[in-house]
Swiss-Prot record:
Keywords for the protein's UniProt record, in alphabetical order: S-adenosyl-L-methionine, Transferase
UniProt-listed InterPro entries: CmoA, Methyltransf_25, SAM-dependent_MTases_sf
Enzyme Commission number(s) from the entry: 2.1.3.-
Gene: cmoA
Protein name, UniProt field: Carboxy-S-adenosyl-L-methionine synthase
Secretion signal span: none
Length: 247
């Protein structure tokens, strides 16, 4: 059962850096729905992409799976046999709940839930990889290497879904979309104190990139095609395709 996010409703004397701990995991579904515009749309459409891209006898990776929402969306939409989903997160609290969540829904496609660092996971025989609001928590210098590894592990015709919070090279646009996101959180019941305290905790651990920077990295990794397929304010998702025809 998800609880309402009230973690930052009272003043916190010493704000540390953000961590996906037990307290966050407990309220995460409520938190992300009220904080990330378009999140539920992205989750459902990841399932639509899975229906199109997942191939028989291949693997799907959900890197930074949190509670498994994207994993479940993918699994509901796989139409082939002998597929496997590998869901990875480095938060013990998230992984514990993810396992329970996935076990509650029965489906023919097996899911392996792995507690570990996504940088250490071997990607192989993949028809689809999902990075759903995950890359932004890696050090910027480490992001290219992960994308390179994903490209190499994808089969021809495979797809990467990359969802992120964006920064903008046009400062005026960036300010507008930042303020729209602020209004979105306020409309969803967050107070100014809650918004401010959460932002202070995230600012050192969630470092955002522009869409142009993401596309540049994807090209460098080898992806022949990439495009923004969803955006709401300063949040969105890209799909990157590896050339070739799926076997």
């Amino acid at each position: 059962m998800s609880h309402r996010d009230t973690l930052f409703s009272a003043p916190i004397a010493r704000l540390g850096d953000w961590t996906f701990d037990e307290r966050v995991a407990e309220v995460f579904p409520d938190m992300i729905q009220r904080s990330v515009p378009g999140y539920s749309n992205i989750i459902s459409m990841i399932g639509m992409l899975a229906e199109r891209f997942v191939q028989p006898n291949t693997q799907v990776y959900d890197l930074g799976c949190s509670l498994g929402a994207a994993t479940l969306s993918v699994r509901r939409n796989i139409r082939h046999e002998h597929c496997r989903i590998i869901a990875v997160d480095n938060s013990p609290a998230m992984i514990e709940r993810c396992r329970r969540h996935i076990d509650a829904y029965k489906a023919p496609t097996p899911v392996e839930v792995v507690e570990g660092d996504i940088r250490d996971i071997t990607i192989e025989n993949a028809s689809m990889v999902v990075l759903n609001f995950t890359l932004q928590f890696l050090e910027p210098a480490e992001r290219q290497a992960l994308l390179d590894k994903i490209y190499l592990g994808l089969n021809p015709g495979g797809a990467l879904v990359l969802s992120e919070k964006f920064s903008f090279e046009d400062a005026k646009v960036g300010e507008l979309l930042f303020n729209m996101h602020h209004d979105f959180k306020r409309a969803n019941g967050y107070s100014e104190l809650e918004i401010s305290q959460k932002r202070s905790m995230l600012e050192n651990v969630m470092l955002t990139d522009s869409v142009e920077t993401h596309k540049s990295r994807l090209r460098k990794a080898g992806f022949e095609h990439s495009e923004l397929w969803f955006q709401c304010f300063n949040f969105g998702s890209l799909v990157a395709l590896k050339a070739g025809v799926a076997a």
